[in-house]
């Protein structure tokens, strides 16, 4: 996807046609409300509460990994935005829309929180993430590829944190 964005390839042109067809296809108030789920002021308190819950239940390492995963979001998203310098759907003069930081924030915060509290909440976290990304596209804040790239990035961030958490649990069990 990144390569297609950089060279303005056929996938990017399809992305632009899809965006033009769906922007403002739902009431703006609804798409704005959905996209706001990716704001730090909404997503970060959810993750912080789940981290506090995990610490309270003796899972400090898991809470640490969730916090580090969230810290990784801007460390990865901002350089990609700078590198690709992709203009926005409604603001062709502005740059830095690829990948979507709101989508990555929502995914890492909500899925991370779900893993910390109860794995049964992961489907709800996935729905919140999907609603966020859909709202961003329908409102015209992001292209669909911006959102898809952030989902891929979120899987990488969460996967790296998950591997670290699993290995720390295995180490604790074998040493105990």
Identify what each model region corresponds to.
Residues 1-42, 81-89:
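N-terminal transmembrane-helix/juxtamembrane module of multi-pass inner/ER membrane proteins
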Residues 24-32, 54, 58, 62, ...:
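Membrane-helix interfacial "entry" motifs
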Residues 45-47, 53-120:
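Membrane-interface loops
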């Amino acid at each position: 996807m990144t390569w297609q964005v950089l060279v303005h390839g056929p996938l990017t042109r399809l992305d632009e046609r899809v965006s033009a067809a769906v922007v403002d296809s739902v009431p703006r108030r609804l798409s704005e409300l959905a996209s706001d789920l990716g704001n730090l002021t909404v997503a970060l308190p959810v993750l912080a509460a789940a981290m506090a819950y995990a610490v309270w239940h003796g899972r400090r390492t898991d809470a640490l990994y969730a916090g580090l995963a969230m810290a990784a979001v801007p460390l990865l998203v901002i350089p990609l935005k700078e590198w690709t310098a992709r203009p926005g759907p409604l603001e062709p003069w502005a740059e830095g829309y690829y990948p979507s930081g709101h989508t990555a924030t929502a995914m890492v915060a909500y899925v991370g929180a779900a893993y910390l509290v109860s794995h049964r909440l992961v489907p709800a976290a996935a729905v919140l993430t999907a609603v966020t990304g859909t709202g961003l596209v329908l409102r015209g804040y992001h292209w669909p590829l911006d959102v898809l790239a952030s989902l891929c990035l979120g899987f990488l961030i969460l996967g790296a944190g998950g591997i670290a958490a699993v290995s720390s649990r295995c180490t604790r069990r074998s040493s105990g």
